[in-house]
A protein has these predicted regions:
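Membrane-interface helix-loop junctions in multi-pass transport and translocation proteins
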Residues: 1, 169-172, 182-214, 218
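Interhelical loop/hinge segments that connect adjacent transmembrane helices in multipass membrane
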Residues: 1-45, 88, 95-99, 218
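Helix-loop junctions and terminal segments of transmembrane helices
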Residues: 15, 72-96, 164-167
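Alpha-helical transmembrane segments of polytopic membrane transporters and translocases
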Residues: 33, 48-49, 62-78, 110
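Residue-level recognition of pore/gate-forming positions within transmembrane alpha-helices
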Residues: 42, 69-72, 119, 152, ...
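Interfacial segments at transmembrane-helix termini and the short loops linking adjacent helices
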Residues: 58, 98-99, 123-153, 199
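Membrane-interface junctions at transmembrane-helix termini in multi-pass inner-membrane proteins
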Residues: 150-180
Length: 218
């Protein structure tokens, strides 16, 4: 490689004078915003298990995690579809193909709406599938399954606009939303638990995702 770069392909040898240091601030700034988003998301979602363990006990943590993994199948399936759209939105944004971006967003919204009956069906079949999966040792209330189905739908719609915003590099909105949610998460989850029980703890991250979807849509 050294011989090639010093000989025939010398014009392609990396050089410091080709580096545009003026772009550092923009690149580091965008990367920093993504870092804050990831840390805030990690804090909020891990805090759920801690709060449930503190206020409802270890058994409730088991119930939550089983139901969460069950409905996360829907979220993961949707994310597989969303992933290639990130780079596609970036390419379309650079080329100013706004009509394509709007049409793609509309199709993703339709897919999100189609996920609602799927989530309802998953709730209806949840007790049977839980028993088939883990046996009858852990009883998971249908209300908890319904709460996590709503959470899955909230993540789906939030993911639509996150994909669009990430593709265009406009992540400040979601950074502020997650920062705010990380600051109020603990008291909000405690209050939600005492008002609505275990299902109320899941209510807070669902509201965050729906809020993210609304802000992204606007």
């Amino acid at each position: 490689i050294d011989k090639l770069l010093s000989g025939r392909y010398r014009h392609q040898t990396p050089s410091f004078h080709l580096v545009h240091f003026s772009l550092n601030k923009k690149i580091v700034g965008l990367g920093g915003q993504f870092f804050i988003i990831m840390i805030s998301m990690l804090f909020v979602f891990q805090l759920i298990n801690i709060v449930i363990s503190r206020v409802a006990g270890p058994m409730a943590v088991t119930q939550y995690n089983i139901a969460y993994k069950y409905f996360n199948v829907l979220v993961m399936s949707v994310n597989i579809v969303f992933t290639p759209f990130w780079s596609a939105f970036t390419d379309a944004y650079v080329k100013q193909e706004y009509t394509w971006m709007k049409n793609a967003r509309n199709k993703l919204e339709i897919m999100g709406l189609l996920c609602i009956p799927v989530a309802v069906l998953m709730v209806l079949l949840s007790n049977f599938l839980y028993t088939y999966w883990i046996g009858s040792e852990v009883d998971i209330p249908i209300s908890l399954s319904a709460a996590l189905a709503i959470f899955a739908i909230a993540q789906t719609f939030g993911g639509i606009y996150v994909t669009l915003l990430n593709g265009t590099g406009k992540v400040r909105i979601q950074m502020l939303a997650y920062l705010f949610s990380s600051f109020v998460a603990l008291p909000a989850m405690y209050v939600s638990y005492y008002w609505f029980g275990l299902e109320g703890i899941v209510l807070f991250p669902s509201i965050v995702c729906f809020l993210q979807a609304i802000l992204g849509r606007v």
